[in-house]
Structure formats: structure tokens, C-alpha cells
């Protein structure tokens, strides 16, 4: 019976994540369409992503506590309703930046519950496989969401036209996906795991979050996995925009075709995640650190590419390496977090660091574009940064292993 309950909970979790992420991705395209219909300034389109990420920082100290205090399925249900509220604001002609920011608030509160429930359902040995399913469903939903959003706002598309404006009509249809996600979230059985957290005392929550942040950064395995996931997601957010600019200048591709190259990375991540679930166990995770160095080197090779098929192949390889790398690292971080604190706190700390890294790297990229830096130079700088950062992480891991082995040897002598 327990196995059946876990299977049902996991199916509902994956389905809720798929539809919610599908809607997030499609809604970004619809929000961009609304900006275009309003003849908004060009900088507002990438600013949508900033407004979406920023709530992750604002809610970092509180989202994990909420996910740990309430049943996580109920939290996922409520946060999908918040996202529905963001759609309603878009339909009410509230400025898209503000309305999409409300969706970001829902996503920020949703994430700790989504990942925090996994250690409650699975033993440590099964966490890599469970994470792989979540990552694969997320990547596939993002791919389909971009296509769905583009299709819904396209002139002459064969979708029901309930509203005259294409972008508003798309937003209305996308809101249905959030409703479906909420239904699946409501079907997740309530877990018996419930943390005692001072949810009514915000200042205590801030202190608890600060303590959780320090605990994870001081833990030998926690600090390595947290550094890696923060670097990866920051680099991934930047690479998403960098590929478009690089493909346009280096390969002469229009925007529509350049966007297809992002699919190569996403497909590679799916393959890498599936490989990780099949062959990588939790205790072997840190042996994959050199894979991060290989990703940085592969990015450097982009500057040598002059043909589209070579570019697609290289980006596919980058995606495979990334999927193979990040899924076990996520699982390791969740495992250490479960051992050191509550699951929701771990994911909140992870989100805080990852989104800080994303905003910082996107800001640097934006400044470089503002200064008219050549795209080839940006690609080289980006690849060198990832490579050197991973080499530092590998070196740090070596130092930690040496210290732990020395302490163990001293204990054995005594």
C-alpha cells in the first residue's frame, strides 16, 4: 500500500510539474507578445526574466518554511493559483512586467515544495532517478511551452479565439494549464513529515534561513554541490541568450532558426539526465566534477564553429554533459539537506544561490552587450569563466578530501 501511495504521489508530482512548467514557458512568449502589442521598449522583454527571478530572492527565507510547514501538495496547489492570478492580471491589462512578476512569486513558493517532497518519497539511493524524472519533465515542458506559446500568438493559428488580441487570447488559454497543474497538485497525498517552523515569526524565519545558508556552505558535500548547481544555473540562464546572439552573428541565422539551437541543448540535457538516472549512483556523484570542466571547454569550442550542423552537435554534447552533471548534484544537495535540515529549507537555499548567480551573470552579460563587446569575446570569456570556476571547485573538493582523510587517519592512530 505504501509503495502504491508513493507511486501515485510521484505521478501526480511529475504531472503537476509538467503542466505548470509548460504554462510558465508558454506564458513568457505570450507576455512578450503583449509587450510587442503595446509597442514597449526593447529592454522590457529580457526584463521579464529578471522580474520572474527576483521573487526567488525575496521569498528565499520564507518559501522553504511554508513548504516544510504545510503539506507540499497543498503548497503546490496554492502556488498554481497564484500563477493563475498572474494570468488574470495580464488579462486585466496590468503591465506585463508586474503581472509576470506575480507568476514569479508563485514559482518561487512552488519550487521548495516540488523538490522538497522527493526526499520524503524516496530513499537516498533512488533520489538520482527521481530527480531525473523531474528534470526531464521540466526540460520537455519548456521545449513544448516555447512552441505552444509561439503557436498561440501566431496570426491565423487554428486555436479558439475567445479574445480578439492574440497575446491576450493565448494568456487565457495558458491559464487552463495552470488549472490542470493545480488539479494534479491537489491529488498528491499529504505527507506525514511536517516540520515545526516559526512560520508566524518572520524575523525568526530570516535567522533560520541564514543558519541554513551557513550550514549548507560549511558542509563538505553541501558546499560543493551548492557551488556547482549555482554555477550551472547561472551559466544556463546566460547561455540561453548567448546562443541566440552567437548564432545570429557567427552563423548568420535568423532568430527563429537560432532558437532551434536551444532545442539541441535541451534534448542533450534530457539524454544526460536519463543516463544519470541509469548509471550514476548518489555516492559516485562527486566523481563527475571534471564533467563541469569539460562543459567550459566545449563552450570555448563554439568560437571555432562555422557550420550549423556542427553547432547543433556541439550544443547537443554540452546539453548531455550538463544533464549528466546537474541531476546527481541536485540529488546530492537534497540528500545532504535532508540530513542537516528540513527539505524545504534546502531547496530555498539552493534557489536563493542559483537565482543570485543567474541575475549576476545576466547582469554582466547585459553590461557587456551595452558596451558593444564582440560576441566571440563574450563566448570566450564565458567559457574561460566556467572552466576556471569548475577547476577551483575541483581543487576545493580535493582539499576537503585531503583534510577529511587526514582527520580519519589521526583518529585511527589514536
Region locations from a protein language model:
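Juxtamembrane intracellular "pre-TM" segments in multi-pass secondary transporters
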Residues: 1-11, 190-227
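Substrate-agnostic recognition of the 12-TM MFS/MFS-like secondary transporter fold
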Residues: 11-28, 51-67, 71-83, 99-154, ...
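C-terminal transmembrane helical hairpin of 12-TM major facilitator-type secondary transporters
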Residues: 286-326
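Structural signature of the two symmetry-related core transmembrane helices
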Residues: 74-89, 286-302, 380-384
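Hydrophobic alpha-helical transmembrane segments
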Residues: 97-100, 104, 129-195, 263, ...
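Extracellular/periplasmic helix-loop-helix junction of adjacent transmembrane segments
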Residues: 26-56
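A single, central transmembrane helix in multi-pass transporters
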Residues: 18, 22-30, 153-172, 214-271, ...
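Transmembrane alpha-helix termini and helix-breaking/packing motifs in multi-pass membrane transporters
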Residues: 29-39, 88-92, 144-174, 245, ...
Amino acid at each position: 500500500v505504501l509503495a502504491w501511495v508513493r507511486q501515485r504521489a510521484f505521478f501526480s508530482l511529475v504531472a503537476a510539474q509538467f503542466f505548470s512548467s509548460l504554462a510558465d514557458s508558454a506564458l513568457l512568449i505570450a507576455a512578450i507578445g503583449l509587450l510587442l502589442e503595446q509597442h514597449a521598449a526593447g529592454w522590457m522583454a529580457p526584463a521579464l526574466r529578471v522580474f520572474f527571478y527576483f521573487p526567488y530572492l525575496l521569498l528565499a527565507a520564507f518559501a522553504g518554511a511554508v513548504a516544510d510547514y504545510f503539506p507540499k501538495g497543498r503548497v503546490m496547489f496554492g502556488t498554481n493559483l497564484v500563477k493563475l492570478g498572474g494570468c488574470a492580471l495580464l488579462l486585466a491589462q496590468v503591465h506585463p512586467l508586474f503581472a509576470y512578476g506575480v507568476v514569479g512569486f508563485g514559482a518561487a513558493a512552488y519550487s521548495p515544495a516540488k523538490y522538497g517532497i522527493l526526499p520524503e518519497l524516496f530513499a537516498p539511493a533512488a533520489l538520482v532517478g527521481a530527480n531525473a524524472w523531474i528534470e526531464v519533465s521540466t526540460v520537455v515542458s519548456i521545449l513544448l511551452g516555447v512552441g505552444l506559446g509561439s503557436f498561440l500568438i501566431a496570426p491565423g493559428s487554428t486555436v479558439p479565439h475567445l479574445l480578439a488580441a492574440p497575446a491576450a487570447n493565448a494568456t487565457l488559454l495558458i491559464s487552463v494549464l495552470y488549472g490542470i497543474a493545480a488539479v494534479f497538485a491537489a491529488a498528491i497525498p499529504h505527507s506525514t513529515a511536517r516540520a515545526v517552523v516559526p512560520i508566524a515569526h518572520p524575523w525568526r524565519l530570516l535567522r533560520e534561513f541564514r543558519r541554513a545558508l551557513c550550514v549548507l556552505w560549511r558542509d563538505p558535500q553541501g558546499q560543493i554541490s551548492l557551488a556547482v548547481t549555482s554555477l550551472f544555473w547561472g551559466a544556463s540562464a546566460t547561455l540561453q541568450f548567448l546562443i541566440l546572439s552567437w548564432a545570429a552573428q557567427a552563423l548568420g541565422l535568423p532568430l527563429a532558426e537560432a532558437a532551434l539551437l536551444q532545442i539541441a541543448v535541451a534534448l542533450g540535457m534530457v539524454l544526460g539526465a536519463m543516463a544519470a538516472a541509469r548509471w550514476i549512483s548518489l555516492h559516485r556523484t562527486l566523481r563527475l566534477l571534471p564533467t563541469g570542466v569539460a562543459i567550459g571547454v566545449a563552450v570555448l569550442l563554439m568560437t571555432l564553429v562555422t557550420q550549423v550542423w556542427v553547432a547543433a552537435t556541439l550544443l547537443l554534447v554540452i546539453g548531455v554533459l550538463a544533464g549528466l552533471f546537474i541531476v546527481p548534484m541536485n540529488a546530492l544537495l537534497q540528500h545532504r539537506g535532508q540530513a542537516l535540515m528540513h527539505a524545504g529549507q534546502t531547496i530555498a537555499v539552493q534557489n536563493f544561490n542559483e537565482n543570485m548567480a543567474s541575475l549576476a551573470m545576466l547582469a554582466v552579460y547585459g553590461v557587456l552587450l551595452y558596451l558593444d563587446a564582440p560576441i566571440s569575446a563574450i563566448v570566450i570569456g564565458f567559457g574561460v569563466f566556467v572552466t576556471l570556476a569548475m577547476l577551483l571547485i575541483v581543487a576545493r573538493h580535493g582539499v576537503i578530501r585531503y583534510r577529511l582523510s587526514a582527520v580519519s587517519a589521526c583518529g585511527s592512530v589514536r
